[in-house]
Amino acid sequence: MKKVLHIFLICCTIFIVSCNKDNGEKIPPPTISFDRETPIYTVKVGRTLVISPMVENTGNSAVYTWKRGDNIIGTEKNLSFSSEEEGSIYVRLNVTTPSGSAEKELRIDVLPFFVPAISMAVPDGGFTVLKGEELSFEPEVEYFDNTSFTWQINLQQVSGQKNYTFLKSETGEYNILFTAVNEDGERSIEFTVKVCEEGDMPFEWMFETLTHNVSSGRTIFLRPYWIKNAFNATYSWKVNDGAVVQSGGTSLFGLNTAGLSIGEHKVTVTMNNSHIERSQIITVNVCAVEGTHRRALTGTIEATRGYFFLPAPSQYTNRDDAPGYTQFSTQEQVNEAIRNNPKSTEYGGSLGAYGGYIVVGFDHSVNNGEGYDLEIEGNAFKGSSEPGIVWVMQDENGDGEPNDTWYELKGSEYGKSGYIRDYAVTYFRPLLGQKVAWLDNQGNTGTIDFLHTHTPNTIYPRWLNSDSYTLVGSRLPARTEEVSPGNWTNLDFDWGYADNFSKKDMLLDDDNANPEGNYIGNHFDIGDAVRYDGQPANLSYIDFIKVQTAVNAKAGWFGDLSTEVGKFRDFNLMK
């Protein structure tokens, strides 16, 4: 009787579940993800790589199909892959259920040997942390299953895991060594961690420049762009050793030059907190009023001179196969190479990841006329925008060099959510063949991928002697999406950016214009120039232009977003 009752209850349960499904409950289609943001895997020739995707909403009836081209290479959830030939291989996984299907693509790089590669952003001089606070280390390591890890503090092993959380209750300096080992070799990264009381934490502030040139009557905005360990500091500002003219918690000071004489003025900012006092002197050269150094109009439409080119690390930095490529050893050599070739750089105008920039100028002052005044070529098309912010400058001191005040040309995203002023990223020199690690002034870290299919042995600018460098500007939010397996799109913004597919400022009426990614111009109005506080700059003309990659993002194995520019033109002469 109990057995009959038990069977009856089971049948009732099945019936109820069936009724629920019939009443409209639907299992969603499957989803696929992998154990890394960019699904690129590496394996040694002749070795087996097991790829275990994370698949949801599959039930018990999922069908798995792994394909290399048109050939099926697997029908299980996990893929065991090996190859006797080196190279990059693209594999597609399809998961199908009664509710639908999902598909993702990944890349497998087959290498003849592989020593573990470590990428980790380590500040110059190591880390500093408050006593009793945790410091988490999560290095990016490319490795195989037989790779082992060790963390040592002062030569004593403390962990055998890839990630490690440092925590010390005693002050002092600790030597940290992280090592990854496999049969092909080992790689290590070594640095120090200084554990301090609050009063001993080193205060740091970084200024983009300590010398400013500005036309008489204008307001110049002085501030550090990166502050560390301020601990509720106050900032006091003096002009020419006079009385304090501003004091409080803000590190931004707007100096109105209307009451100052033409010439050099010293501005002193003093930081005070409960532990230390620190001062910095900033030189402000008040120049003659706007228009004094205005240059006469010529018939030259295009920019005639390049002044400065400094890309961020990227897949196209140091490319040996670029037309006219030259191996530079100093920044001065790079600048000289573009001096008479402002069309772009020797790479065709690729500015690299966030912050990379180029500065060009004209043989005349470009007027702020009616409508658009400037045209800057980029190679954007629908679904492929890599926006750069445009800055403009007058030759305020009349020396013919772009060493005056930059004004941002306000675009459609200015001041909106995700837009950040004074956004700074520090890039760190890697070992050859490895990713470039970065650290930003918002507390984030990441890497610029080393793509075997695009780059030589390093993506860090070869000509820089320093082991790190910092780029600062304004940042736009990323609009990068994977719309289908292996197919990434970089969506455009409405208007106001270089290398951005905007029908409005490209003067187009076709959504599918420029499908081949040829160079085509975005157009800009000098009237959109704004001061640091967002107020109109009211420039009558400009002499110099800077374009800077404005997004910090990656599009899968296509790599980093990198603004690309071509010719710069005075559009007033084209109307």
Model-derived regions, located:
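A short beta-strand segment in extracellular, disulfide-stabilized domains
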Residues: G46-N57, K131-V141, G217-I227
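Solvent-exposed loop segments of extracellular immunoglobulin-like
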Residues: N57-T65, Y143-T150, A230-S236
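Surface-exposed, flexible coil segments in extracellular/virion-facing regions
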Residues: T65-S82, T150-L167, K238-L255
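Conserved structural position at the C-terminal beta-strand
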Residues: V95, A180, V269-M271
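A domain-level signal for the mature, folded cores of soluble proteins
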Residues: S136, E204-M206, I281-E386, K410-K575
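Extracellular interdomain linker/stem segments of modular secreted and single-pass surface proteins
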Residues: D109-A117, V195-P202, N285-L297
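Acidic, glycine-anchored loop motifs typical of Ca2+
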Residues: E396-T405, Y423
